[in-house]
Amino acid sequence: MSEKTFLVEIGTEELPPKALRSLAESFAANFTAELDNAGLAHGNVEWFAAPRRLALKVANLAESQPDREVEKRGPAIAQAFDAEGKPSKAAEGWARGCGITVDQAERLKTDKGEWLLYRAHVKGESTEALVPNMVATSLAKLPIPKLMRWGASDVHFVRPVHTVTLLLGDKVIPATILGIQSDRVIRGHRFMGEPEFTIDNADQYPQILLERGKVIADYEARKAKIKADAEEAARKIGGNADLSESLLEEVASLVEWPVVLTAKFEEKFLAVPAEALVYTMKGDQKYFPVYDNAGKLLPNFIFVANIESKDPTQIISGNEKVVRPRLADAEFFFNTDRKKRLEDHLPRLQTVLFQQQLGTLRDKTDRIQALAGWIAGQIGADVNHATRAGLLSKCDLMTNMVFEFTDTQGVMGMHYARHDGEAEDVAVALNEQYQPRFAGDDLPSNPVACALAIADKMDTLAGIFGIGQHPKGDKDPFALRRAALGVLRIIVEKNLNLDLQTLTEEAARLYGDKLTNANVVDDVIDFMLGRFRAWYQDEGYTVDTIQAVLARRPTRPADFDARMKAVSHFRTLEEASALAAANKRVSNILAKATEPLNDIVHASVLKEAAEIELARHLVVLRDKLQPYFADGRYQEALIELAALRAPVDEFFENVMVNAEEKDIRINRLTLLSKLRELFLQVADISLLQ
């Protein structure tokens, strides 16, 4: 069967830069699935993405599906014909579905009986006939939150479409995709190269687009070029470029032909906190800031143009003129804000609503102040500093700088607090209260900051759950999932002695009578334990390990973590599988027991050697392990419990649990319950697979 290279390129208006990669990857994944489902043999499926195009190139695509033999078994002969030998309705219906008559059907004989059988040789469809619908289906499944319609057409897509190139080798596959007739025409760069040209063969892509159209269609190659050129440009001025992955991705999605240039701004602006300047450069202008080797911001920035200019100084000058007013604004706001102390902004917090049922930002501040102080007392942080940090926590939201540059919240609070002479751990806490902002983000660095960060997040969790507005589906307007995971990470990774039960109760208590959900504490704890499940799955723990610990519902996050590590280690022991199975057996036996058990195992009632030996082991281990459980030394405890494998195996091998004599039966059930209780001090290992 012959094979050829296949190319599809969808030429569009400028695609959303933050979605470009996901659109291209989804297009490739969807189309690959279509090929596989159709049984079309193919090689590598390569995706390309630039601001005005999505493309796929498939190596060694078969020109048709393979022929195949089809067999359809019909009714058994006994049901296929009546007593007179006439076909039954069931047989006739089956035959019609196969496109034959009953007398054309074959017979299938086996040891189990005889059936009607239809056999056919089905010729594979051509790739040319299959591909158009496969492309259309793949595009329809793209993750596009909001579709556009353009002109008088009813066609919807993420952006208006201008060209559709569909080639199998050197042949155009005729089709209408997104309202456009397929062709071999490709559009180049808007301002360089050939604006439009034809491609003779799919193998020429993407090189022909690079040479004639001045477009680097390879997304990763374009991104790598920007990174390498920006690093070199920074080195030339003695600095290091801040090439954050997210901004690199966005810039790579904005340009077709990247040209890296270096510009500068006035040194006087360096008196403004670097975070505000960087916010403007990265967030508004998509520039890369440059730092010296000591990490200090330099009065330079690197940007990426989408054109090769005969006079790049004009482009540089233009970008410098664009950024200067924004930096001047930041300077003005910074100088104006410092004329007031942070504390002076407290009254204005009363004018900003946190949530209609939960009050204003001033109300939230009062709660955070009290809760941060309470948490500080629990974890050994400075209570006065934590309370002070809570009082000032939202004041920077009322400053000119944060109002204009919203992403500087927290960090500007830190700078203004330092200017006001606040304690350093208070100032740092104002910045770190929002950490961790995302997965893998840094945690608050000092105990006061930890107390404030936990207080802020727990206040939101208790309040929103307290009025019954918990997250539903993908909707989470108050970022409660992030808040819950942030609290858990801080407590676990900082090894803080905090209990979710008392923590949530205190957070809810501070709302007074504003909360309407009587189950708010349990709801918040269940929600947070659910985030634990997601966290540990991401960390690579198995679902049954997580379930085994969750079954005990530990509400101290640091304790939960210790149990997780203990059970995970226990699974590596040779005895683990047998003991998990034994615990499952014990659990099932106890679940079926209807008689009340004894408080203790009565040694005088023990008869068999195996039950006497098991009881002896349990007594020894119970006394030995109590300090382990009290100190949270769960891994050591489970290692000790692994020694029970032999006596447990002996017990089930030689002892009849449900003995006829009631006192013996109840004593043996009590013995098993004591065995299970020991393991349940750590986790329900009966859930381990």
Swiss-Prot record:
It comes from Salmonella schwarzengrund (strain CVM19633). The keyword Hydrolase does not apply. Its EC number is 6.1.1.14. Tetramer of two alpha and two beta subunits. The keyword Transit peptide does not apply. It comes from the Bacteria. This is Glycine--tRNA ligase beta subunit. One of its GO terms (biological process) is arginyl-tRNA aminoacylation. GO terms for cellular component: cytosol. The lineage of its organism: Bacteria, Pseudomonadati, Pseudomonadota, Gammaproteobacteria, Enterobacterales. The gene is glyS.
